[in-house]
Structure formats: structure tokens, C-alpha cells
């Protein structure tokens, strides 16, 4: 049996539900509006376009969120924690390795302007999905690669794009993709200061970086 004290030393070990921190019932307080999109409610309601949601984990959520809010067709972004056990965790608890969560970006997008396949292409190309419980210099379960799908169609498209990107990675000499692909669990939103962090702190840390491998244009959903 792995003890909590041992997990604190080795953050590459996923805790069990019994080992995870208990968390709390109260969610984090969030600002009403998106810091970048100004008049757009952070969590809706969204009245324009054909709205859908995507959930991606690709390392530190500060840099990941910025890349997605810069994409045309994205109408809102929120960062949070998902895939673990602890309800409504704090950032410090997630960093301890004792929640099981990974850092994620909830992407709200207009399907008439950007497709899920296009967002998947961004996801694969923005980070290295072969690194297991780390992303670059950021090490731990909270930095693992993940796609959490909000519909059966998203799940099918995510797996198909993974297989296509794996073929391209193989050509470039990379290993196997370790990205977790599953139905969407509960996303616990991160503290207010994390939301749109790099818009508030332009010189802040951003550890996101891809492999240089790209999907063929025919598979990018353009």
C-alpha cells in the first residue's frame, strides 16, 4: 500500500480514492465575466452561435488557456481540475499529488466557427502527449495529458485523432501517446487568480511546448 507521505515524495503516483484528500463541498468563487472577452459571462449563458464544450489537459493550464482563448470561434475559457477524487480542491492540494486531478481548460466554442476536430489538432500540436505524468519541466499527476469528452461523438473523434497523431509521432521517432481519453468527469474550477492568468500577468510562467509534429491538413478539421 502506498502511503500519503510516499505520494508526497513521488508525485508520479496516482492516489486511490481512499488516499485522496477529502476536499470540501463549497466550490471556488469565480469572477462573473471573462477577463479577456470582457462582457462575456465566464460560465454563460451564451446566446450566440451553436455552443459546445471541450475539456483538455496539456500541462500547466495558464499557457494552455491562453492558446485556446486566442483561437477564433472560442467564446470562453475556464481553468480547473478534473480526473481525480477530491471535490473542490485548492491549487495547493492539487500540487500535493493527493487529489488525483490534472489541470484542465474548459473551452466553450461556437461550432459554426471552429470545429472540435480543429481544437483536437491544436491540443495534440501544443504539447508532448508522450510524457506520462509530466509536461516538460512540470512533473506530477496534475500535468498529465487528458481529453475529457462531453459526448459519444467527441469520444470517437478524440480516439481517431489520437491514432492519427500517433502515426505522425512514430515517423518522428517519438514514443506512445499517454493521453487519458475518457468521458467528462466533474470539472472543479480553479481559484479566481488562475482564470486568464497570463492576460493579467503577461510575463508569467508558461511551460507549454509541442513536439513540432503536426497532423496532416486533411485531418485537422479545416
Curated annotation (Swiss-Prot):
Pfam families per the UniProt record, alphabetical: PMSR
Gene Ontology biological-process entries: cellular response to oxidative stress; protein modification process
A GO cellular-component term linked to this record: cytoplasm
Keywords, alphabetical: Oxidoreductase
Keyword Cell membrane found: no
Active site: 60
E.C. no: 1.8.4.11
Enzyme class name: oxidoreductase
Listed GO MF terms: L-methionine-(S)-S-oxide reductase activity; peptide-methionine (S)-S-oxide reductase activity
Catalytic activity: L-methionyl-[protein] + [thioredoxin]-disulfide + H2O = L-methionyl-(S)-S-oxide-[protein] + [thioredoxin]-dithiol; [thioredoxin]-disulfide + L-methionine + H2O = L-methionine (S)-S-oxide + [thioredoxin]-dithiol
Main function: Has an important function as a repair enzyme for proteins that have been inactivated by oxidation. Catalyzes the reversible oxidation-reduction of methionine sulfoxide in proteins to methionine.
Record HAMAP family: MsrA (MF_01401)
Family: Belongs to the MsrA Met sulfoxide reductase family.
NCBIfam families per the UniProt record, alphabetical: msrA
Name of the featured protein: Peptide methionine sulfoxide reductase MsrA
Species name: Pseudomonas putida (strain W619)
Gene name tied to this protein: msrA
Amino acid at each position: 500500500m502506498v502511503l500519503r507521505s510516499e505520494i508526497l515524495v513521488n508525485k508520479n503516483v496516482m492516489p486511490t480514492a481512499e488516499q485522496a484528500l477529502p476536499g470540501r463541498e463549497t466550490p471556488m468563487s469565480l469572477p462573473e465575466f471573462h477577463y479577456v472577452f470582457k462582457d462575456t459571462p465566464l460560465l454563460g449563458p451564451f446566446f450566440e452561435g451553436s455552443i459546445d464544450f471541450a475539456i483538455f489537459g496539456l500541462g500547466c493550464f495558464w499557457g494552455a488557456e491562453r492558446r485556446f482563448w486566442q483561437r477564433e470561434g472560442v467564446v470562453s475559457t475556464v481553468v480547473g481540475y478534473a480526473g481525480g477524487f477530491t471535490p473542490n480542491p485548492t491549487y495547493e492540494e492539487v500540487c500535493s499529488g493527493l487529489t488525483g486531478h490534472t489541470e484542465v481548460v474548459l473551452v466553450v466554442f461556437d461550432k459554426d466557427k471552429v470545429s472540435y476536430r480543429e481544437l483536437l489538432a491544436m491540443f495534440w500540436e501544443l504539447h508532448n502527449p508522450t510524457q506520462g505524468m509530466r509536461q516538460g519541466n512540470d512533473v506530477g499527476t496534475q500535468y498529465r495529458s487528458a481529453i475529457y469528452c462531453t459526448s459519444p461523438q467527441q469520444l470517437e473523434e478524440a480516439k481517431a485523432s489520437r491514432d492519427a497523431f500517433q502515426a505522425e509521432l512514430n515517423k518522428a521517432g517519438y514514443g506512445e501517446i499517454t493521453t487519458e481519453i475518457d468521458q467528462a468527469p466533474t470539472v472543479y474550477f480553479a481559484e479566481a487568480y488562475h482564470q486568464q492568468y497570463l492576460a493579467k500577468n503577461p510575463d508569467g510562467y508558461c511551460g507549454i511546448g509541442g513536439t513540432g509534429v503536426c497532423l496532416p491538413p486533411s485531418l485537422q478539421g479545416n
